[in-house]
Amino acid sequence: MLYKNNLLILLIISMFTFFEKVDAKYEKLFFDHSIKNINNETIDLNQYKGKTILLVNVASKCGFTKQYTGLQDLYEKYKDRGFYVIGVPSNQFGGQEPGSNSEIKDFCETNFNITFPITDKTDVKGEDAHDLYK
């Protein structure tokens, strides 16, 4: 019995010997961020806490541009149940979103009757990526 106790104590001491203190760094959660909408107004993502968000990269000159129709349908069908779509236009995927914010807004409203929130054109990768994507 003494042998087992000593072995257990040795095991516990060994475990803590290999642990290293690590300073915890506060990481922002999704809902701690804000992002500008297509009209340059702030979208506080905290307003969506407790809801389901589909944050989707979009582009008007992309092979998937027709996805706007499906995204709008999803938004309309489920927004009253707490499901929201937020479109994030970016020109960082093969230059497929070259337009200005006003051109993007006009394109989305004219061609797809988009009513879900769309952000301003946003960098989503690289050094200048929006904090939400880091």
PLM features: residue spans?
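Bacterial N-terminal signal peptides that target proteins for export
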Residues: M1-L8
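Aromatic (phenylalanine/tyrosine) cluster motif
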Residues: Y3, F16-F19
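Bacterial N-terminal signal peptides
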Residues: I9-T17
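N-terminal "domain-start" segment that seeds a small globular fold
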Residues: V22-N46, D131-K134
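Amphipathic alpha-helical repeat scaffolds
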Residues: N37, N57-K61
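Local sequence-structure signature of Cys/Sec-based thiol-disulfide redox active-site neighborhoods
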Residues: K49-L54
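Short hydrophobic beta-strand elements that form part
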Residues: V56-N57, G87
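Structural microenvironment flanking redox-active thiols in thiol-disulfide oxidoreductases
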Residues: F64-H130
